[in-house]
């Protein structure tokens, strides 16, 4: 919708406002990998591109003179989930990579090193032809997310593959 330059500038303006007004415990941006996975990426590719996008924000904010410890805690992530085995650890792997990079490359404090993430179960895993099994698919994906210690979770409705979800 927007050019990359405009989007980064807009997000930078929002983040500068958050810092100036001391807005805490509210996420200025949710760095999303959900759409990447729903477009066909496997879990490893989703993670790689999402973290890359996150580091793009970090580098841009730093280039505008913001302090890593001022904006780091305001970043969150949004991942898709599926039944591939890698989904059982996507959050743990993301947290480890993020924390190490934030500490070792950027000198971030503990709070800024924390990766907070939301999981939504995969819409593309739901089938119109086997709709009765969609609840099972979603349940397995939700269990992966819970066992991986996600911060928040959205589960899709069983009929999301064929219509606007009912419940």
Name what the model sees in each region.
Residues 135-142:
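Short, acidic/polar
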Residues 39-48, 82-93, 121-135, 163-167:
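Short glycine/threonine-rich loop-to-helix capping motif typified by GTGT followed
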Residues 48, 99-100:
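Conduit-forming functional cores of very large proteins
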Residues 1-81, 86-87, 105, 112-118, ...:
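Catalytic alpha/beta active-site cores
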Residues 140, 151-167:
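Active-site or pore-adjacent capping/gating segments
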């Amino acid at each position: 919708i927007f050019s990359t330059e405009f989007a980064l500038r807009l997000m930078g303006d929002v983040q500068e406002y958050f810092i100036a007004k001391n807005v805490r415990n509210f996420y200025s941006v949710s760095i999303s990998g959900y759409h990447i996975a729903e477009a066909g990426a496997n879990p490893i590719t989703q993670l790689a591109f999402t973290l890359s996008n996150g580091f793009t924000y970090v580098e841009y904010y730093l280039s505008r003179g913001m302090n890593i410890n001022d904006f780091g805690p305001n970043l969150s992530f949004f991942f898709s989930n599926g039944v591939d085995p890698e989904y059982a650890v996507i959050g743990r792997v993301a947290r480890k990579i993020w924390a190490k990079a934030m500490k070792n490359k950027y000198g971030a404090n503990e709070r800024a090193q924390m990766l907070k993430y939301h999981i939504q179960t995969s819409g593309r895993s739901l089938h119109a032809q086997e709709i009765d099994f969609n609840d099972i698919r979603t349940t397995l994906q939700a269990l992966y997310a819970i066992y991986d210690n996600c911060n928040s979770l959205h589960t899709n409705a069983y009929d999301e593959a064929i219509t606007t979800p009912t419940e």
